[in-house]
């Protein structure tokens, strides 16, 4: 998966998980998505994407909440507290 494609995909996962995390009927569907976000957040790919964003290498109009230092962490913390 190319960098922009990956960032867009992960951003969509993050948005969906944030919207649906409080709906307990969706938790079984969210679990693999949360795991995928966690894997990305702890991978060298996330760090490279973040570094490239900070270096101005990504399009300025790209939605990039996934690259914030807290977005995934806050979601994972909330997810853990709900289980």
Region spans (language model):
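Long, low-complexity or tandemly repetitive, helically biased scaffold regions used
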Residues: 9-12, 19-25, 32-83
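Short, structured coil/loop segments at alpha-helix boundaries
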Residues: 1-2, 23, 27
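Short, charge-rich amphipathic alpha-helices with coiled-coil/heptad character
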Residues: 1-14
């Amino acid at each position: 998966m190319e960098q922009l494609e990956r960032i867009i995909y992960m951003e969509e996962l993050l948005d969906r998980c944030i919207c649906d995390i409080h709906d307990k009927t969706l938790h079984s569907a969210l679990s693999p998505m949360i795991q995928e976000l966690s894997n990305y957040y702890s991978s060298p790919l996330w760090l490279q994407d973040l570094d490239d964003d900070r270096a101005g290498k990504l399009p300025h109009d790209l939605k990039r909440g996934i690259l914030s230092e807290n977005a995934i962490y806050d979601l994972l913390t909330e997810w853990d507290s709900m289980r």
